[in-house]
């Protein structure tokens, strides 16, 4: 399947939940892009007036190919897909695509980088930034926690596990604050298979103070919600922006890996421009 032929497809046509044959030869046609606008329409977002900037940062831990003499090379890849791309890349298709490199010979890692950049950019419909770290060069990885207030120790009763933005409230009579709030209790489900997705969610904002207990209830309300990682983060961003009216807002999540990949969406009004690729302990 050619990525350019699938840009209007929804998730139901993806390889998720289907039996597949793993390819041992390079196969860019395995990439399955999904139109972002299908789910953005539900949020009332127009493609030319998005309320956020940002990216989807992917870490690929099972990247390997053969060198010119047939010897395997192992590496870690990082892919940054801009939110302005018309398409996201379905995760199982990306895993299958990366596996197709396993028996393919490349003269040097530069060719792998260029091939990944070309194929992923074609699938997403926008330039994708690619970096590759060969394991023989001993790349390092930093683990850490967000610098902010952890919500998970708030002692509250919760009985709602379907998304409910009504939990989100701010004190509009109080002075403006600048703070970072986070939780390890984000859990949603794959849009297609229903498999659980686990993540840490971080909100950084400047504006009226957000009610922390309500925010925690809202995060937990995603527990039975079915959407892709990127779509959940955009929904959270839009709900917080509309109901809490922060002057500046950034939302990002670090999801646990599946199939050798983790996905880390980042959305911001623009004041907060980036987040560090610091691994969450479950990654």
UniProtKB/Swiss-Prot annotation:
Main localization is cytoplasm
Provide the residue positions that the database annotates as binding NADPH.
91-92, 258-259
Q: Name one GO cellular component term.
A: cytoplasm
What is the E.C. number? 1.7.1.13
Keyword check for Coiled coil, yes or no: no
Write down the InterPro entries for this protein, in alphabetical order: GTP-CH-I_C/QueF, NADPH_dep_7-cyano-7-deazaG_red, QueF, QueF_N, QueF_type2
**Binding site residues for substrate:** 89-91, 229-230
Q: Which segments of the protein form a coiled coil according to its record?
A: none
Q: GO terms for molecular function, please?
A: preQ1 synthase activity
SUPFAM superfamilies per record: Tetrahydrobiopterin biosynthesis enzymes-like (SSF55620)
Which of UniProt's keywords are assigned here? Cytoplasm, NADP, Oxidoreductase, Queuosine biosynthesis
Q: Which Pfam families match?
A: QueF (PF14489), QueF_N (PF14819)
Question: Where would you find this protein in the cell?
Answer: Cytoplasm
Q: According to its UniProt record, which residues of this chain constitute the active site?
A: 190, 197
Q: In which pathway does it act?
A: tRNA modification; tRNA-queuosine biosynthesis
Which reaction(s) are listed as its catalytic activity?
7-aminomethyl-7-carbaguanine + 2 NADP(+) = 7-cyano-7-deazaguanine + 2 NADPH + 3 H(+)
Q: Which GO terms describe its biological process?
A: queuosine biosynthetic process; tRNA modification
What is the recorded function of this protein according to its Swiss-Prot or TrEMBL entry? Answer: Catalyzes the NADPH-dependent reduction of 7-cyano-7-deazaguanine (preQ0) to 7-aminomethyl-7-deazaguanine (preQ1).
Q: Which family does it belong to?
A: Belongs to the GTP cyclohydrolase I family. QueF type 2 subfamily.
Self-association or partners: how does it assemble? Homodimer.
The protein's name: NADPH-dependent 7-cyano-7-deazaguanine reductase
User: Organism, per UniProt?
Assistant: Aromatoleum aromaticum (strain DSM 19018 / LMG 30748 / EbN1)
């Amino acid at each position: 399947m050619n990525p350019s032929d699938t840009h209007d497809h929804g998730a139901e046509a993806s390889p998720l939940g289907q039996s597949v044959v793993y390819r041992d030869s390079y196969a860019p046609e395995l990439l399955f892009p999904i139109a972002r606008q299908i789910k953005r329409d539900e949020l009332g977002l127009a493609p030319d007036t998005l309320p956020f900037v940002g990216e989807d940062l992917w870490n690929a831990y099972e990247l390997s190919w053969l060198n010119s003499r047939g010897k395997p090379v192992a590496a870690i890849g990082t892919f940054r897909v801009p939110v302005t791309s018309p398409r996201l890349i379905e995760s199982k298709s990306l895993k299958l695509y990366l596996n197709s490199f396993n028996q393919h010979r490349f003269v040097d890692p530069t060719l792998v980088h260029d091939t990944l950049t070309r194929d992923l950019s074609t699938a997403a419909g926008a330039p994708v930034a690619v970096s590759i770290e060969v394991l023989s060069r001993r790349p390092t990885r930093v683990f850490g926690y967000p610098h902010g207030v952890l919500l998970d120790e708030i002692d509250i009763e919760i009985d709602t596990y379907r998304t409910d933005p009504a939990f989100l409230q701010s004190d509009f009579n109080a002075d403006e604050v600048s703070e970072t709030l986070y939780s390890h209790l984000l859990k949603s489900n794959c849009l297609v298979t229903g498999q659980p997705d686990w993540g840490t969610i971080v909100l950084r904002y400047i504006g009226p103070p957000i009610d922390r207990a309500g925010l925690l209830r809202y995060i937990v309300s995603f527990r039975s919600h079915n959407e892709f990682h990127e779509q959940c983060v955009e929904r959270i961003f839009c709900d917080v922006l509309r109901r809490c009216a922060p002057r500046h807002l950034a939302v990002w999540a670090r999801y646990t890996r599946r199939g050798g990949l983790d996905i880390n969406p980042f959305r911001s009004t623009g004041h907060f421009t980036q987040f560090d690729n610091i691994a969450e302990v479950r990654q």
